[in-house]
Curated annotation (Swiss-Prot):
It comes from Schizosaccharomyces pombe (strain 972 / ATCC 24843). Glycans are attached at N99, N190, N212, N216, N233, N284, N297. The keyword Cell division does not apply. It holds the Pfam family CDC50. GO terms for cellular component: endoplasmic reticulum; endoplasmic reticulum membrane; Golgi apparatus; phospholipid-translocating ATPase complex; plasma membrane. This is Phospholipid-transporting ATPase accessory subunit ivn1. Disulfide bonds join C75-C111, C166-C181. Residues 61-325 are extracellular. InterPro entries: CDC50/LEM3_fam.
Amino acid sequence: MSQTEIVKKPKHKRFKRPDKSRFVQQTLPAWQFIFTPWTVLPLLFLLGIVFAPLGAGMFVASRRVKELRIDYTDCMNIGDEFKQVPSTNIEFQYKNVKNVTAMWKSSGDVCTLRFQIPEEMTSPVFAFYRLKNFYQNHRRYTVSADMFQLLGEARTVAQLKSYGFCKPLEANEEGKPYYPCGIIANSLFNDSYSSLLRYESFDSSNSLGLYNMTTNGTAWPEDRERYKKTKYNASQIVPPPNWAKMFPNGYTDDNIPDVSTWDAFQIWMRAAALPTFSKLALRNVTTALQPGIYEMNITYNFPVTEYKGTKTIMFSTTSVIGGKNYFLGILYFVIGGLCAASGVILSIACLIKPRRVGDPRYLSWNRGKSS
């Protein structure tokens, strides 16, 4: 062999063998919990001791929430004279109250409610609108928005159509994009509520003062991060079709909505999981709502009868767990009760007829060692 020849080293044959480490070979030390009466029974009693009182506390807290609901779906059929609201349209929760009276009338597109607050409602006081039979949780509905547009980007029609979620409400017949586009924005709840005027009686015409309620701060802080002021100018965009009442002459440089500060819009865009839901409309966090007769004017815009739905105005206080929620307290109490009852039953069974259950000495691979 010449010196110029290159000596080739033999290649080592590679084997597809896994690493011999304990982790790869699954031979790490392990411990498995063995269920015996002496481990299960304390756990059941502990769960019962924790969950049952917790559920009872939640139930009691919900009982202390003061709440008034008035279904005003049929208000526009009443006429311009005050008439009594049917008792079936009123729901309430007050400690020592068995009856609450309310009156209503309509004029034009305004529904006027005059109702009784029988007990003081301590601040904060919240006003919610409640819709029934409205399915915001439909997938086609919940995804019908362009998040880049809501974050302030001036999206073109081509970009909206390529994204596809706003279909069929990306643009009008002239090719101008809707702002904001999509079904969920187009169906924005647009009833508006006034603050409360206090009166001496249902027949009185002289108000005693104003109980101010505001929309400021009603949206969640994390929702505000999802919206920015738009970079569109008024000539580039048009309002969604169902916003014609709010913007009869379209957008101008002075009236383009700033969705980053529009709490009602942000609240509506957070889709509800169930067909019956409540969303915050107004609040007062500083002043208690004193007992008396109050009046609220509601601009009646949002249709509900077409899909056999209803709409309700609801006034409520809060508790340590939020608003009224009996289900959560009952659920915790039932789980705690079942755990405690199971513990008692198993304890009696073990005392009356004990069995060699869960004892590791009686496992097949341990029997030889014990003998």
